[in-house]
UniProtKB/Swiss-Prot annotation:
PROSITE patterns: NIFH_FRXC_1, NIFH_FRXC_2, NIFH_FRXC_3
Binding site for [4Fe-4S] cluster: 94, 131
Protein name: Nitrogenase iron protein
Record EC number: 1.18.6.1
Pfam families in the record: Fer4_NifH (PF00142)
Entries under InterPro entries matching the protein: NifH/chlL_CS (IPR030655), NifH/frxC (IPR000392), Nitrogenase_Fe_NifH (IPR005977), P-loop_NTPase (IPR027417)
Named cofactor requirement(s): [4Fe-4S] cluster
EC top class, as a word: oxidoreductase
PTM remark: The reversible ADP-ribosylation of Arg-97 inactivates the nitrogenase reductase and regulates nitrogenase activity.
Cofactor note as given: Binds 1 [4Fe-4S] cluster per dimer.
PANTHER family, per the entry: LIGHT-INDEPENDENT PROTOCHLOROPHYLLIDE REDUCTASE IRON-SULFUR ATP-BINDING PROTEIN (PTHR42864:SF2)
Amino acid sequence: MRKVAIYGKGGIGKSTTTQNTVAGLAEMGKKIMVIGCDPKADSTRLLLGGLQQKTVLDTLREEGEEVELEDIIKDGYRNTRCTESGGPEPGVGCAGRGIITSVNLLEQLGAFDDEWDLDYVFYDVLGDVVCGGFAMPIRDGKAEEIYIVCSGEMMAMYAANNICKGILKYADTGGVRLGGLICNSRNVDNERQMIEELAKKIGTQMIHFVPRNNFVQRAEINRKTVIEYDPTHEQADEYRALAQKINDNKMFVIPKPLEIEELEALLIEFGIAN
């Protein structure tokens, strides 16, 4: 079973990219579990046809310790197993702590047991690695390969570099490795070349360049992944290509994060800071 975590700046399109990629893998016949590690609980919505499923933390609050696996896992597109960790009430408690509670509960209830015959577990993790709780999939060895969703925008690249610092910190203890950068295009000038160069400097690869296409939003409005909404669309093939590249990937590295000056020099070189 491969344990994958998707990180990236808030709003970069992590959940959309994760769900569309998972749909591509499911189409290949892979058995997958998706764990949403975001208080917004929107990491599985497209796989479930828009169903806002009850989160692990909400279920725990309402039912106490009497929680069964079927209470917190729903079957989505092509039998993907979907669960959302959820978060505390706004202004109360720690969302990162909630992720730890949720994943530990899933383990206790046997969500990852051999009987499920899983090929992949995907963790869709909120935003930047800003606290220990959100770093938990990296830190505790829950995830073994990380993909960072980014774009040619400065803050997305800054966040990607920060996440690499988190991976570096826990690479020895958790055994986690970086599998590559996924460029979710924002149509920035020289974007593909810039992210390829960033990947090279960090010591990794740009595993796929996902072109910007408004059809993704159209599929989302219809509460579906692109592959489910229109399997013949060119954007569906982009996500299939990304899924295939992740499935075939053999390049797993300990990243070499850049200094902020190096990052700014890269932005200047490709004309974005001019």
